Amino acid sequence: NLIFTKQAQPVVVTVLQGPKEFMRFHKGDETMENIKNLTILHSNDMHGDFLAENVDDHLIGGVSLLSGYVNKVRKEERNVLYCIAGDMFRGSVIDSEFRGISTIEIMNMLAPDVVTVGNHETDYGIAHLLFIEKCAKFPIINANLHITTNNARLFKPHHIVEIDGMKILFIGILTESVIAQTKNERLIGSFVN
């Protein structure tokens, strides 16, 4: 159980494990009709690898299966968010050849609600990442990458999704070790010291 506050009133979030993750918001002893479900679908570390693999005569992974699942849940449930926690790039021959552009085009079809920058998003360089962000039809966020000469943020630091009267805040942060990997980009830094 996680505890959040909304207008100074405690709100408990219960995450139920299973094929889907449901978050139920409880305030005191309210009746079931006042409880809202929020389904959060999450993926990360796709690394530009979009093909399913045959494991024990079953297809595992792949964007077509992921897309089918995300679309199925979006049709069956109310209040569904799909989020990607980075590392969309670098790992497949196709992604490397097209430097992430092919990946972004496929991600656009998945229509995530929000994406954070992961450690491999910087592999093609910060300037290319900013170009790729312009190709995305979804928000890409990061709160701590900035230009060292003027402290200008490279990305929007957060994204708020409003759904069924709920406001869900997403914040994207890279660790210092990831930022250190971009050391050849001397003008890029972090607000974290």
Residue ranges and their predicted role:
Residues 19-31:
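Short, Lys/Arg-enriched N-terminal segments with co-localized hydrophobic residues
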